[in-house]
Amino acid sequence: MTEYKNIIVTGGAGFIGSNFVHYVYNNHPDVHVTVLDKLTYAGNRANLEEILGDRVELVVGDIADSELVDKLAAKADAIVHYAAESHNDNSLKDPSPFIYTNFVGTYILLEAARKYDIRFHHVSTDEVYGDLPLREDLPGHGEGPGEKFTAETKYNPSSPYSSTKAASDLIVKAWVRSFGVKATISNCSNNYGPYQHIEKFIPRQITNILSGIKPKLYGEGKNVRDWIHTNDHSTGVWAILTKGRIGETYLIGADGEKNNKEVLELILEKMSQPKNAYDHVTDRAGHDLRYAIDSTKLREELGWKPQFTNFEEGLEDTIKWYTEHEDWWKAEKEAVEANYAKTQKILN
């Protein structure tokens, strides 16, 4: 196992990145973390407020700023790259920030890792693989060969967001082969937990209910996502960073397949609302049907396994967090719903 003393976490003030920083802070006291975050709408200094100090430093800046990245990389022994524009709906309206941050930003970071010969881990998404048929339409009912994503699945991105993440994955692979950069890649399924921006599916529904707004469901809600608690994602990334083989791709998943309708109705039930108290709205353009991850490689090779496997308990904890942290999300709620209203038409 490789040990690190000084790591850079890009996007470490965002949802998944800040949870990773909290994980490192709480479990690896000898590691100093420099968070590099542009603090766009999806980043929040408050996500790190309680741990900023001698062991966690926040640098506000752009991952595509080569001079800043060079300065930070010169003092680091690893870069863990979370920073990304990640909201599919936004990528359909304006793809340009996704190309700039997800592709150009990754290139700048790779060049710094190459220059200083430091470890690089690239955090990516299962959306680079496109989507899968529903379990009921497959001969193996979702468990047969090719019925879940693996590291060998061909890339088939279907949105501007996922295409820029696929492109960034590919340049990481190229920099490993062409320049010997010590890099790994992880592709993860849908995360949930604290600090997630309220434009995302689960926190949007929770905060709608808390705000007296009817939740919204794309289409019929048949689209399936493979949910994983963000804390399990953090331990998976740490396992890859410290034990993963250079040049390899590992998929992080917790066997949490549920369709959107099922998740929304569970949220309503947990919040003491009628299970049908939501509106169907027009579906997202090119909406991927099903995601499902086979994480066998990560589990068998690196000994990782998820701990937060009870989705209902994890969802209850998440609902409790948003209920108790209204000051964290309330100011943005009106603007988020106004943005959705521009493209979503109520069907029922």
From Swiss-Prot:
Its EC number is 4.2.1.46. Keywords: Lipopolysaccharide biosynthesis, Lyase, NAD. NAD(+) binds at residues 15-16, 37-40, 62-63, 82-86, 101, 161-165, 191. SUPFAM superfamilies: NAD(P)-binding Rossmann-fold domains. It catalyses: dTDP-alpha-D-glucose = dTDP-4-dehydro-6-deoxy-alpha-D-glucose + H2O. Homodimer. This is dTDP-glucose 4,6-dehydratase. It comes from Streptococcus mutans serotype c (strain ATCC 700610 / UA159). The gene is rmlB.
